[in-house]
Regions:
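Extracellular beta-rich ligand/substrate-recognition surface
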Residues: 28-36
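Phosphate-binding beta-alpha-beta segment of Rossmann-like dinucleotide-binding domains, i.e.
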Residues: 108-142
């Protein structure tokens, strides 16, 4: 078992401007099982159909320890955290149902494909192609 404590993980986004106009954010990244580091990453614009969220809080869940300990098949590095609350701060093209400033929550399920048998029947929870937040794509320890 890895030696780490969840209490050492910051849960708020710190956005800063470096140089002229290059915005970054800080995150807690796991570069390999049990190896945490605080990193600065570029603040990217959201892609089509996506939103960018400024994290206000992120819970710590037992499944996050699985991410940290390498239990899941993960492409490293990874930012854990799937119990996220924040506000939308940017919209990708084509986004119509959301607004900048709107408070949102992000859970474990990181989306559904919309094409598999389950999705076609409205059963998004059992989508065969979904990615999990903090496991298959970066989470809220940012």
């Amino acid at each position: 078992m890895s030696s780490y404590t969840h209490e050492t993980l910051p849960t708020q986004l710190s956005s800063e401007v470096e140089g002229d106009i290059k915005a970054t954010y800080r995150a807690i990244e796991v570069s390999r099982p049990g190896q945490f580091s605080e990193v600065s990453r570029p603040l990217l614009d959201p892609g089509p159909g996506h939103v960018r969220i400024r994290v206000e809080a992120c819970g710590v869940c037992h499944s996050d320890s699985g991410t940290v300990e390498g239990v899941f098949p993960i492409n490293w590095p990874r930012v854990p955290g799937h119990e996220v609350v924040g506000r939308i701060d940017a919209l990708g093209s084509g986004v119509q149902r959301w607004a900048v400033g709107q408070r949102v929550g992000v859970g474990f399920l990181g989306g559904a494909c919309g094409y598999c048998e389950f999705c076609r029947n409205g059963d998004l929870v059992n989508c065969r192609n979904q990615g999990y937040t903090g496991i298959y794509h970066d989470g809220g320890y940012a």
